Amino acid sequence: MSSPALLDVFTSTGALLNGHFKLTSGLHSNTYFQCAKVLQHPEHLAEICRHIADHFKKNNIDTVISPAIGGIVVGTEVGRQLGVKTIFAERKDGAMSLRRGFSIEPGEKILVIEDVITTGGSVAEVIEIVKSYGGEIVGVGTVVDRSNGKVTLADNQYSLLSLEVRSYEPADCPLCKDNIPLESPGSRASKNN
């Protein structure tokens, strides 16, 4: 799937939003990718995840792990297409952890999957969890990389759509200075209120 084709899918499903948004990272932006609006359609989910799975299929992956909540749907479908176990990390008391009986064995080959990367903070936390269990990171896959490749989390990193979308520190946000109402559409409260 080409970048223009994926952008068309985001646009046609109402998943590419323009306005003034507070991102999970605490940064502000005039563009928001609401992946859930694309991924709710099984045909889009399957096609998007097929491209990600195809990129990593020769890496002998044992397990796919995703950060909750945005990465769970993508991670589960990529894992299904690769025929491997899928798990997720979730926040407890503000920190990512494995719960629900999930575990990682030493030497287990792990692929980290996320829907959207801006700063890479959640994925970096998941990578640290994997390493703390002795797992081996074989790659990171995402649907959208808002940093246009500036955020590098693994040697083998793949994003279906990689583009630079402006993000601002709240104190430097021109949208705030123009008094444009701020929306917080993310899956959890942002880090910087």
Swiss-Prot record:
Tell me which EC number(s) this protein carries: 2.4.2.10
Tell me which stretches of the chain form a coiled coil.
Answer: none
Q: What class of enzyme is it?
A: transferase
Reaction catalysed?
Answer: orotidine 5'-phosphate + diphosphate = orotate + 5-phospho-alpha-D-ribose 1-diphosphate
For this UniProt entry, the molecular function terms from Gene Ontology, in alphabetical order, are: magnesium ion binding; orotate phosphoribosyltransferase activity
Domain of life assignment:
Bacteria
InterPro entries (UniProt xref): OPRT, Orotate_PRibTrfase_bac, PRibTrfase_dom, PRTase-like
Q: In which pathway does it act?
A: Pyrimidine metabolism; UMP biosynthesis via de novo pathway; UMP from orotate: step 1/2
Question: Which keywords describe this protein according to UniProt?
Answer: Glycosyltransferase, Magnesium, Pyrimidine biosynthesis, Transferase
- Which cofactors go with this protein? Mg(2+)
Q: Cite the binding residues for 5-phospho-alpha-D-ribose 1-diphosphate.
A: 114-122
Q: Which GO terms describe its biological process?
A: 'de novo' UMP biosynthetic process; pyrimidine nucleobase biosynthetic process
Sequence positions that bind orotate: 118, 146
Name the family the entry cites. Belongs to the purine/pyrimidine phosphoribosyltransferase family. PyrE subfamily.
**What biological function has been recorded for the protein in this entry?**
Catalyzes the transfer of a ribosyl phosphate group from 5-phosphoribose 1-diphosphate to orotate, leading to the formation of orotidine monophosphate (OMP).
Question: What quaternary arrangement does the UniProt entry report?
Answer: Homodimer.
Q: List the NCBIfam families.
A: pyrE_Therm (TIGR01367)
Spell out the protein name for this chain. Orotate phosphoribosyltransferase
> What organism, scientifically named, is this protein from?
Prosthecochloris aestuarii (strain DSM 271 / SK 413)
Q: What is the lineage of its organism?
A: Bacteria, Pseudomonadati, Chlorobiota, Chlorobiia, Chlorobiales
